């Protein structure tokens, strides 16, 4: 219902045509996602199904910016990688019915690309945590953890500031180094136990969907191949002879594709450095950067509509157009504020307001700081066009953010 009920959906800049479609297409896309996901699980027409799964899942994520999560971005990337892997080479319907040659082994690049992607997610999340709020003020965990103090056994500990500091520092070191311990055979199983504990705990404390489960199962890919082979032998019988021949050797085009993909993944998260100001405040270059659960922000955005000819002014009830979730997310994200301002301009113009002037009185609090003005209230947002350049109409935070 989150894609059906709201009167307005926030598009990604440059991808406005992918904003939430008509209801029949919404249902059709979800049905396609379900069917293709089942096909991938069973290994049925794997190549087609994996592509359909990637396209449908990613298409759904592009419907509305307000539902963006790093975790969904990660799932899209893993789904994209899966499209190119020979994951149906064994224990699949494709192999059973000889649509593909069963493979007893695969080349290292099929593991390497997954390892790199997992490593980037973890390490970049760790780098993002190297900031004063996270390490020296234990924020936002100092705000979030006490809310779970009623939990049995561990609950009372969560009420202490000391626990927030322990979680903050451990979280940083975990993200920075867990990939190294997973790669090292001598520490792999201890690391896996840590992964299970860490993600189980975060899944319990925070509403982050399937991400903990995804990362726990992803960690099993670091196990020695003999373990996976034993599992295959125990649960799946091979009806056909497996080939030792490498059918998936990586040629020059493949090397270029993988290299380009990795380079992009390494560089893209740092685009925030191209913008002035603190990116945690301005949100510029913030998405797609693995800054996972790094800030606690909330805001209030009161839009004001002024008739350009008569000067008559009115206030907007955001909930008339947006869901509670959309309004919450929009209140501290400037590109969403701008998109909604343009929507309001068009809607009120239809209602007879002459070329409406759209301004906003927006205040935001971040990591427990006092609320501060977020948007220049003198700017007519209906005349501002979005771009990848710096948004000069974002107000600077009056305090110091490190």
Residue ranges of predicted features:
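Alpha-helical membrane-anchoring segments
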Residues: 1-402
């Amino acid at each position: 219902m989150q894609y059906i009920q709201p009167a307005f959906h926030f598009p990604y800049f440059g991808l406005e045509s992918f904003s939430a479609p008509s209801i029949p297409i919404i249902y059709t896309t979800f049905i396609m996602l379900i069917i293709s996901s089942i096909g991938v699980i069973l290994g049925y027409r794997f190549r087609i199904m994996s592509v359909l799964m990637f396209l449908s899942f990613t298409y759904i994520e592009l419907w509305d910016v307000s539902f963006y999560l790093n975790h969904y971005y990660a799932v899209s990337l893993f789904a994209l990688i899966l499209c190119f892997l020979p994951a149906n080479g064994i224990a699949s319907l494709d192999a059973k019915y000889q649509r593909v040659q069963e493979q007893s082994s695969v080349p290292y690049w099929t593991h390497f690309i997954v390892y790199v992607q997992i490593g980037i997610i973890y390490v970049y999340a760790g780098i993002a945590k190297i900031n004063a709020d996270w390490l020296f003020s234990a924020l936002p965990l100092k705000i979030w953890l006490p809310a779970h103090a009623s939990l049995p056994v561990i609950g009372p500990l969560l009420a202490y500031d000391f626990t927030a500091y322990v979680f903050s520092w451990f979280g940083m070191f975990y993200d920075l180094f867990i990939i190294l311990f997973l790669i090292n055979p001598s520490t792999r199983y201890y690391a896996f136990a840590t992964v299970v504990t860490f993600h189980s705990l975060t899944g319990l404390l925070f509403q982050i969907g399937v991400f903990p489960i995804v990362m726990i199962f992803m960690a099993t890919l670091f196990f020695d191949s003999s373990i996976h082979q034993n599992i295959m032998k125990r649960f799946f019988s091979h009806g056909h002879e497996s080939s030792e021949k490498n059918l998936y050797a990586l040629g020059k085009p493949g090397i270029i594709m993988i290299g380009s993909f990795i380079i992009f993944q390494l560089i893209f998260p740092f685009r925030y450095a191209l913008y002035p100001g603190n990116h945690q405040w301005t949100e510029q270059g913030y998405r797609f950067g693995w800054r996972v659960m790094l800030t606690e922000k909330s805001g209030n955005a009161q839009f004001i509509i002024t008739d350009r000819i008569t000067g008559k002014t009115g206030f907007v009830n955001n909930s008339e157009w947006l869901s509670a979730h959309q309004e919450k997310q929009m209140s501290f994200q400037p590109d969403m504020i701008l998109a909604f301002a343009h929507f309001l301009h068009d809607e009120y113009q239809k209602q007879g307001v002459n070329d409406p002037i759209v301004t906003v009185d927006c205040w935001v609090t971040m990591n427990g700081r006092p609320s501060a003005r977020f948007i220049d209230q003198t700017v007519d947002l209906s005349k501002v066009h979005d771009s990848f350049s710096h948004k000069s109409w974002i107000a600077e935070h009056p305090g110091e953010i490190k």
